Regions:
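Short, exposed beta-strand/loop patches in secreted or surface proteins that constitute
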Residues: 1-5, 294-297
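Conserved beta-strand hairpin/beta-sheet module of binuclear metal-dependent hydrolase folds
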Residues: 2-56, 149-162, 166
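Short Pro/Gly-enriched beta-strand edge/turn motifs at strand-loop
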Residues: 4-10, 106-110, 131-133
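Short Gly/Pro-enriched turn/cap motifs at secondary-structure boundaries
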Residues: 13-15, 117-119, 139-141
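Metallo-beta-lactamase
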Residues: 31, 38-40, 134-229
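Active-site HxH/HxHxD metal-binding segment of metal-dependent hydrolases
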Residues: 40-43, 50-130
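Soluble or luminal CAZymes and related metallo-dependent hydrolases
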Residues: 41, 120, 180-184, 278, ...
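C-terminal regulatory/interaction regions
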Residues: 233-307
Length: 307
């Protein structure tokens, strides 16, 4: 969807799967960026945000949730724009302020996240002025129990984060650690439907206008996961491997096995869903799945990401 269909004062910096999209808001209420990508792209994020702001300062950094691909650029942006304020969802504010890594998701998935400063929390259930527009802040549990979405009602623009993509939604992380959350996904999809957005800016991928079709696809995927939670768990394990390969490009087999064996979320997935499969065999089977899908190449002791 061409960016010129977004109203003035909202710019989408479309990234990829390693880094979330960044949404730059400018206007009479100052300037803000919503979500900041992954740590290894932090310098690029700073450059992209500077370019989008032109000569303006960055006043506010907003995170829809604290997964590493959505807040990994926070520290770099804080260093580049020291007067900026960082607002996060309230559910993880205490853990982030004290930097209790065991309570933040990146430690369990073996991902990178530089520590950043927390200046305040988003007003869930209320509105916040960012750039030219007023944004309503809604709770959007499911993908993450503390996630929020932001909706600008004047132009019906929705920043959906990972609650809704054009083709699905993000992994349902609470389900992966034994907490029921498929009902929360369903409730969030119903909330999005009730807002009737004219434009959806997802956490990954281009903005899109056909929310109804995206919701239908998301509900179909949710039904499949409800029917077979093991399918969701296996998909999650593959996604974790692929995400790390997007970061590294290539991996020595020994280094991969060290990372895999230490990842707490993978340990939990195996114990919960795949305990009948020996750990080394399960690990190898996941690589074979990814190779069969054309996502990676195996060459001797190297594991290589394929674009």
């Amino acid at each position: 969807m061409p960016e010129n269909l977004l109203p003035a004062g909202i710019a989408l910096l479309e990234r990829g799967w390693l880094s979330s999209n960044n949404v730059v808001c400018t206007g009479r209420h100052g300037s803000a960026v919503i979500d900041t990508g992954y740590a290894v792209h932090a310098d690029q994020t700073v450059g992209l945000v500077r370019h989008a702001l032109a000569d303006r300062p960055l006043d506010v950094i907003v995170n829809t949730h604290l997964h590493s691909d959505h807040c990994g650029g926070n520290a770099a942006l804080q260093a580049a724009f020291p007067a900026s304020r960082t607002l996060i969802p309230p559910g993880e504010a205490d853990a982030a302020r004290a930097w209790r890594e065991g309570l933040l998701s990146h430690s369990g998935t073996g991902q990178l996240l530089p520590r950043f400063r927390v200046d305040g929390v988003l007003p869930v259930g209320e509105s916040i002025a960012l750039g030219e527009h007023e944004w309503q802040v809604y709770p959007a549990a499911g993908h993450d129990p503390h996630s929020v979405i932001l909706f600008a009602p004047r132009h019906r623009v929705l920043v959906s984060a990972d609650a809704l993509w054009e083709n699905g939604f993000g992994l349902v992380f609470p389900e992966l650690v034994g907490h029921a959350a498929f009902d929360a996904v369903q409730a969030t999809l119903s909330l999005i439907e009730s807002l009737q957005p004219s434009v959806v800016i997802p956490g990954h991928g281009p903005a899109f206008a056909d929310a109804a079709s995206a919701l239908a696809r998301a509900r179909s995927r949710l039904a499949a996961y409800r029917k077979d939670p093991k399918r969701h768990a296996r998909h999650a394990a593959r996604v974790m491997i692929r995400f790390k390969l997007l970061e590294l490009g290539r991996w020595g087999r020994a280094e991969f096995e060290q990372w895999f064996d230490a990842a707490r979320l993978l340990q939990h997935l195996h114990a919960e869903h795949f305990a009948s499969e020996p750990w080394p065999g399960w690990r190898d089977a996941l690589l074979e799945d990814l190779q069969g899908a054309g996502a990676i190449a195996l060459s001797g002791d190297l594991i290589i990401n394929r674009p």
